[in-house]
Regions:
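N-terminal helix-loop segment corresponding to the beta1-alpha1 unit
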Residues: 1-195
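Glycine-rich beta-alpha junction loops
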Residues: 44, 130-131, 203-208, 247-248, ...
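Short Pro/Gly-enriched beta-strand edge/turn motifs at strand-loop
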Residues: 46-48, 221-227
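Active-site-adjacent beta-strand anchor residues
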Residues: 76, 98, 201-204, 252-255
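Conserved Rossmann-fold dehydrogenase catalytic segment
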Residues: 132, 160-170, 191-207, 228-235, ...
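Oxidoreductase and adenylate-handling cofactor-binding alpha/beta cores
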Residues: 154, 176-197, 209-222, 263-273
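C-terminal substrate-binding/catalytic lobe of Rossmann-fold NAD(P)-dependent oxidoreductases
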Residues: 183, 234-237
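Aromatic-enriched alpha-helical interface/lid elements that frame and gate functional surfaces
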Residues: 238-287
Length: 287
């Protein structure tokens, strides 16, 4: 995009009540695409992520990374004067994004019905660990909690050991992306109909989208297939995963129609006709 070209979301204003990672990822995507994002930080300390990853000049690189291009204002949300400022901002915004525990926005009289009284076509995106409704809704949670509930944790690590966790924010970031896409769709819907939306985006729901085959294998087989952890390897395809080699660890993804190519690269074409090596299922047993 050239310097003089208008950004995709120029003219869209987002009021951002989010902290940590999932919510800030959602609003950062809007900021990166040219929307005006106004981040509300709770006085007196501001966003708590300002206190971590202080690598240089006493500034949090975590906070910088996940809040790029945003404006910021520190407001005491427990003070009537602070809430008055918030209520002045809302009619001027297209979107409100929050990731408080479900019920907190209602406690501040900032739930969707209240927001609609201030701006009839407002779009509210509520991001939480376990959803806005249902038996788990009132429980607080983080990425790894939702990951465990979803069954994803059970698929990471070696089958004969306890599950592991990935040291990256898979759930938070993917939930932020889901939220941003939902808001973009709501903006399109509003342009067509004049109506706003309340979007319920949960880490738990988004984690289910990360199950490539586990859920449908188990449900489709009537429970006969029990997906298991495969350690360094994909549990149902081979070769697929990390393998030890003379020069160090390598990543191979040569299953199905790529198997002949790998055999040729290894100068092992005899494996193409060798019993026990013909299908992915046969090769999985041998890895």
């Amino acid at each position: 995009m050239s310097a003089g070209e208008e950004h995709l979301l120029s003219g869209i204003r987002v009021l951002d009540f989010t902290r940590a990672l999932a919510g800030p990822t959602c609003t950062r995507m809007f900021a990166e695409l040219g929307a005006e994002v106004i981040k509300i930080e709770a006085a007196p300390l501001g966003d708590l992520t300002r206190k971590i990853s202080k690598l240089r000049a006493d500034r949090s690189f975590y906070h910088i990374q996940h809040n790029l291009n945003k404006k910021s204002v520190c407001i005491n949300l427990r003070d009537p004067k602070g809430m008055a400022l918030v209520r002045e901002l809302i009619p001027k915004c297209d979107v409100v994004v929050e990731n408080f525990r479900p019920g907190v926005m209602a406690d501040m009289s900032l739930d969707y019905d209240s927001l609609k009284q201030m701006k009839s076509d407002i779009i509210l995106c509520s991001i939480s660990a376990l959803g806005q409704e249902g038996p788990l809704a009132k429980k607080p949670g983080y990425d790894y909690i939702a990951q465990a509930y979803s069954g994803v944790t059970s698929m990471i690590g070696h089958s004969d050991e306890s599950p592991c966790i990935p040291l990256v924010g898979i759930g938070d970031v993917s939930t932020g992306v889901h939220g941003a896409f939902g808001i973009a769709a709501a903006l399109l819907h509003r342009a067509r109909t004049g109506r706003g939306q309340h979007l319920d985006i949960s880490l738990l729901d988004c984690y289910y989208h990360n199950h490539e085959v586990n859920v449908h294998q188990h449900s489709g087989s009537g429970g006969k297939i029990m997906p298991t952890r495969g350690g360094r390897h994909v549990s149902y395809l081979c070769p697929a995963g990390v393998y030890r080699a003379n020069g160090g660890d390598i990543m191979l993804m040569a299953f199905m129609h790529h198997w002949p190519d790998l055999c040729a690269a290894m100068d092992k074409n005899e494996l193409l006709e060798k019993e026990g090596w013909l299908t992915d299922a046969e090769r999985v047993v041998r890895q």
